[in-house]
Amino acid sequence: MIPVVALVGRPNVGKSTLFNRLTRTRDALVADFPGLTRDRKYCRAEWEGHEFIVIDTGGIDGTEEGVETRMAGQSLVAIEEADIVLFMVDGRAGLMAADKGIARHLRSREKTTVIVANKTDGIDADSAVGDFYSLGMGEIVPIAASHGRGINSLLEQVLLPLVSDGLAEAEDEFAPWPDDEAEVLAREEEEEPFDPQSLPIKLAIVGRPNVGKSTLTNRILGEERVVVYDMPGTTRDSIYIPMVRDEREYVLIDTAGVRKRGKVTETVEKFSVIKTLQAIEDANVVLLVIDAREGISDQDLSLLGFILNSGRSLVIAVNKWDGLSSETRDEVKEALDHRLGFIDFARVHFISALHGSGVGNLFESVNEAYQCATKRVSTALLTRIMRMAVDEHQPPLVRGRRVKPKYAHAGGYNPPIVVIHGTQVKDLPDTYKRYLMNYFRRSLGIMGTPIRIQFNEGANPFAGRRNTLTPTQLRKRKRLMSHIKKNK
């Protein structure tokens, strides 16, 4: 599960500066939902190949007595969502009453916390952080966020414990890309057959507040299904609900909390950005619910962007379709085509969760998307498709030389990854890369999931090697050099 890091502290201690430094941007909201997330910013960040989510909470400007009340708002939610809290203080201003109040609250929540003393550039850091040890929260990490000093050591201390388990698993599973097609084929023969269809499909239902996620979830659970049991999820408040439909096992990831089975009336749903993002990360297929009466919003596009970046399969459900006039429906479809043209691989369903129309068809697209995302494809087939694509449309010249793709093999699944080996393949223009991606998609019949193309250039075995000249070649070279010197 992707780690979550929350930044908390008084105003003007540098939380936003550190947020921008970690995310390498100055305006990178994953989502900004009115009301519930107005005072919190979320962004996906990466360090040394490790991904994590950063939450910037707005300053807590209450007094020592009032800070407990202040923390009950947006910052409290961020702290509960986080795996680790970076408690930021001002190294120049020293220890303040509000810092003590925040520290008391953090201790009461028993959250893993690291005190980060900012603005320590140009001063004696050891002396500046001395007062903060009285908070009794362990070691203090001095940084200068505006200049980027101390950021790497901070991330080492914060992230490495969170990703250590993931690193061990990755090392066990990692195998370098072979440079030889025969080696790939031999490795495929050695692999034990694995059937992803034997596993339950993890389906996350996500969307903005009040689009009908609650109603759709209850409709799914109340329609011709066998609910095995309700199992609280390991990711904070999300609920994992194993269920069976048409003899196929699913795990429904419910981000809207526990609701009574019989209650299908629409209510205002408590919405957590982190719960939604983590549900997307943990799912095989994401069902994005859109309100037909409100159309596509910027928040919907933000969620779509996160889903695509995560490489998850996608099915779109346009809810509240009942009651719309034919003219309004045509306008909605036109708007969808205009704003969602970049994800033409996803199936779009028009449903009414309240009345159940169109809900049953969703699972056909969910199963299709999962099958396409986990389909095993041989190296021979991928190489044949690649050569057909090259024959139909030759790669352009790069620095006067023709790019030569040699062979292709599968580099991963969910999403499908095709690795193309060859000379200068990394220099292909984006237009040709998109052509290859679309060609593979059409040839393999992939729907409902993004597909990624990666390029690998084998090392030149003759690089740096100099041929030994024969005696005849040495005499010829000597005469040539003598001739050149005479003509100068």
Curated annotation (Swiss-Prot):
Function comment: GTPase that plays an essential role in the late steps of ribosome biogenesis.
EngA-type G domain sequence ranges: 3-166, 201-374
Keyword Nucleotide-binding in record: yes
Protein known as: GTPase Der
NCBIfam families xref list: GTPase_EngA, small_GTP
GO biological process: ribosome biogenesis
Top-level lineage group: Bacteria
The family this protein is said to belong to: Belongs to the TRAFAC class TrmE-Era-EngA-EngB-Septin-like GTPase superfamily. EngA (Der) GTPase family.
GO terms assigned for molecular function: GTP binding; ribosome binding
Organism: Sodalis glossinidius (strain morsitans)
CDD domains per UniProt: EngA1, EngA2
Positions with a binding annotation for GTP 2: 207-214, 254-258, 319-322
SUPFAM superfamilies to which the protein is assigned, alphabetical: P-loop containing nucleoside triphosphate hydrolases
Claim: Repeat is one of the keywords in the record: yes
Keywords of this entry: GTP-binding, Nucleotide-binding, Repeat, Ribosome biogenesis
